[in-house]
């Protein structure tokens, strides 16, 4: 378990950062390229541990995948060309891999067994396995399909019209991917619109997808045709530096190539509402996945209320939003964020516990947290508990604190941002 010491930053964070590739899009590009017909080239791929787990799983099913830096080539096998894996498919720490891949495996006539690390073993799978069973897939797991390892034997599926109890892009995507070979029209309706990378990318691969309000539909029997994918920078990774630029005195950061998919930009809306000073320069208007360069500088923030439809658009950014709120004048209330409890850690409990160690005034609620600003943070020993987003949030907190912060289990950040600490060090000079 590696630890990392973060010293206070005296002269602010300044400079340019090129944000690494979007994790969600990188996963999907490999998966969709694998089940497409033809050769797909992916540029800007994120070489984090999670996305490498996706590559490993599809290689295990006979897909030819080669990687050269951030460029990946996938020679697709088509929906019917995947081979039965000889070994257990290990997704590591990646919830995206196991949930989306389950939708693909539900289509396959062969047997597969899927597992991950200790964190994955605690995460709820029934939200995916239940609808896939309704479609006709044979899926089982611990506690009646609630937890990994999962065993899957797919086959002939029937389309369903599924009303999802949660706004989850992973649940929606698993069902849509299963629907590609299902008989009939598969439809998923959510309580709020979740991120739509799957819909956008399926369309890029030639699949017709219909969107009607909170419902997404596709007809079975459609094939994917290989295409080239340009992956923009991950706005969830950018979020840590957006907040850092806003709350660390004497800072000015230029973040290049930040993905601006409107289902993911809740962090931008929240920072704007809190009073952050930034400019956005679009760089690829008209692309399937829009991107921009963002300049942000030290700002005076105020507390706000966050809840409702915006939550699915910023669910992964809530840990660092909570940090921003500790440096805002007034009270910030975050609600409707039950999904935080089933992430890599229970992020409500983890955020509250670790920021409290640093002197923040913050309370957990059943569906979020209440943060009382403005707090002077102090040095202490904290822990990521294997959660990459907690680790990065604590590192930004360390730049502000009076005294050094020691982060235990700091290597967890490699899941989504392998060069994070190098970037932070460079900007602090």
Swiss-Prot record:
<feature type="binding site">
    <location>
        <position position="343"/>
    </location>
    <ligand>
        <name>3-phosphoshikimate</name>
    </ligand>
</feature>
<feature type="binding site">
    <location>
        <position position="24"/>
    </location>
    <ligand>
        <name>3-phosphoshikimate</name>
    </ligand>
</feature>
<dbReference type="InterPro" id="IPR001986">
    <property type="entry name" value="Enolpyruvate_Tfrase_dom"/>
</dbReference>
<feature type="binding site">
    <location>
        <position position="316"/>
    </location>
    <ligand>
        <name>3-phosphoshikimate</name>
    </ligand>
</feature>
<feature type="binding site">
    <location>
        <position position="23"/>
    </location>
    <ligand>
        <name>phosphoenolpyruvate</name>
    </ligand>
</feature>
<comment type="subunit">
    <text>Monomer.</text>
</comment>
<feature type="binding site">
    <location>
        <position position="123"/>
    </location>
    <ligand>
        <name>phosphoenolpyruvate</name>
    </ligand>
</feature>
<feature type="binding site">
    <location>
        <position position="170"/>
    </location>
    <ligand>
        <name>phosphoenolpyruvate</name>
    </ligand>
</feature>
<feature type="binding site">
    <location>
        <position position="170"/>
    </location>
    <ligand>
        <name>3-phosphoshikimate</name>
    </ligand>
</feature>
<dbReference type="InterPro" id="IPR006264">
    <property type="entry name" value="EPSP_synthase"/>
</dbReference>
<comment type="pathway">
    <text>Metabolic intermediate biosynthesis; chorismate biosynthesis; chorismate from D-erythrose 4-phosphate and phosphoenolpyruvate: step 6/7.</text>
</comment>
<dbReference type="InterPro" id="IPR023193">
    <property type="entry name" value="EPSP_synthase_CS"/>
</dbReference>
<keyword id="KW-0057">Aromatic amino acid biosynthesis</keyword>
<dbReference type="Pfam" id="PF00275">
    <property type="entry name" value="EPSP_synthase"/>
</dbReference>
<dbReference type="InterPro" id="IPR036968">
    <property type="entry name" value="Enolpyruvate_Tfrase_sf"/>
</dbReference>
<keyword id="KW-0808">Transferase</keyword>
<comment type="similarity">
    <text>Belongs to the EPSP synthase family.</text>
</comment>
<feature type="binding site">
    <location>
        <position position="347"/>
    </location>
    <ligand>
        <name>phosphoenolpyruvate</name>
    </ligand>
</feature>
<feature type="binding site">
    <location>
        <position position="389"/>
    </location>
    <ligand>
        <name>phosphoenolpyruvate</name>
    </ligand>
</feature>
<dbReference type="GO" id="GO:0008652">
    <property type="term" value="P:amino acid biosynthetic process"/>
</dbReference>
<feature type="binding site">
    <location>
        <position position="28"/>
    </location>
    <ligand>
        <name>3-phosphoshikimate</name>
    </ligand>
</feature>
<dbReference type="GO" id="GO:0009073">
    <property type="term" value="P:aromatic amino acid family biosynthetic process"/>
</dbReference>
<feature type="binding site">
    <location>
        <position position="23"/>
    </location>
    <ligand>
        <name>3-phosphoshikimate</name>
    </ligand>
</feature>
<comment type="function">
    <text>Catalyzes the transfer of the enolpyruvyl moiety of phosphoenolpyruvate (PEP) to the 5-hydroxyl of shikimate-3-phosphate (S3P) to produce enolpyruvyl shikimate-3-phosphate and inorganic phosphate.</text>
</comment>
<feature type="active site" description="Proton acceptor">
    <location>
        <position position="316"/>
    </location>
</feature>
<feature type="binding site">
    <location>
        <position position="168"/>
    </location>
    <ligand>
        <name>3-phosphoshikimate</name>
    </ligand>
</feature>
<dbReference type="GO" id="GO:0003866">
    <property type="term" value="F:3-phosphoshikimate 1-carboxyvinyltransferase activity"/>
</dbReference>
<protein>
    <recommendedName>
        <fullName>3-phosphoshikimate 1-carboxyvinyltransferase</fullName>
        <ecNumber>2.5.1.19</ecNumber>
    </recommendedName>
</protein>
<dbReference type="InterPro" id="IPR013792">
    <property type="entry name" value="RNA3'P_cycl/enolpyr_Trfase_a/b"/>
</dbReference>
<dbReference type="GO" id="GO:0005737">
    <property type="term" value="C:cytoplasm"/>
</dbReference>
<dbReference type="GO" id="GO:0009423">
    <property type="term" value="P:chorismate biosynthetic process"/>
</dbReference>
<feature type="binding site">
    <location>
        <position position="95"/>
    </location>
    <ligand>
        <name>phosphoenolpyruvate</name>
    </ligand>
</feature>
<keyword id="KW-0963">Cytoplasm</keyword>
<keyword id="KW-0028">Amino-acid biosynthesis</keyword>
């Amino acid at each position: 378990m590696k630890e990392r010491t973060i010293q206070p930053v005296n002269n602010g964070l300044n400079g340019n950062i090129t944000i690494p590739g979007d994790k969600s899009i990188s996963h999907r590009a490999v998966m969709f390229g694998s089940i497409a017909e033809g050769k797909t080239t992916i540029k800007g791929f994120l070489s984090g541990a999670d996305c490498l787990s996706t590559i490993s799983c599809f290689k295990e099913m006979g897909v030819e995948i080669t990687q050269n830096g951030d460029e990946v080539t996938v020679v697709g096998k088509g929906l019917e060309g995947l081979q039965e894996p000889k070994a257990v498919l290990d997704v590591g720490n990646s919830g995206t891999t196991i949930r989306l891949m389950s939708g693909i495996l539900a289509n396959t006539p062969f047997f597969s067994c899927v597992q991950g690390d200790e964190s994955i073993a605690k995460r709820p799978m029934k939200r995916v396995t239940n609808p896939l069973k309704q479609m006709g897939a044979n899926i089982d797991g611990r506690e009646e399909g609630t937890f990994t390892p999962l065993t899957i034997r797919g086959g002939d599926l029937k389309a369903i019209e599924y009303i999802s109890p949660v706004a989850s892009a992973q649940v929606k995507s698993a069902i849509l991917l299963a629907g590609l070979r299902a008989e009939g029209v598969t439809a998923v309706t959510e309580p709020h619109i979740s991120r739509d990378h799957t819909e956008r990318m399926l369309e890029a691969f030639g699949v017709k997808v219909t969107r009607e309000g909170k419902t997404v539909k596709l007809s079975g029997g459609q094939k994917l045709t290989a295409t080239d994918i340009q992956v923009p920078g991950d706005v969830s990774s950018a979020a840590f530096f957006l907040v850092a630029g806003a709350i660390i005195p004497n800072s000015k950061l230029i973040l290049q190539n930040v993905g601006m998919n409107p289902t993911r930009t809740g962090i931008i809306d929240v920072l704007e509402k809190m009073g952050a000073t930034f400019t956005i320069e679009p760089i690829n208007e008209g692309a399937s996945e829009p991107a921009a360069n963002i300049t942000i500088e030290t700002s005076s923030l105020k507390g706000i209320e966050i809840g409702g439809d915006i939550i699915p658009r910023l669910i992964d950014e809530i840990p660092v939003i909570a940090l921003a709120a500790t440096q805002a004048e007034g009270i910030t209330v975050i609600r409707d964020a039950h999904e935080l409890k089933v992430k890599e850690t229970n992020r409500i409990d983890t955020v509250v516990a670790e920021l409290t160690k640093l002197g923040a005034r913050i309370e957990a609620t059943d569906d979020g947290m209440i943060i009382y600003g403005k707090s002077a943070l102090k040095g202490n020993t904290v822990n990521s508990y294997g959660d990459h987003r907690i680790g990065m949030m604590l590192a930004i907190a360390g730049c502000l604190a009076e005294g050094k912060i020691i982060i235990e289990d700091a290597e967890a950040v490699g899941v989504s941002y392998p060069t994070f600490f190098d970037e932070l060090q460079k900007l602090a000079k």
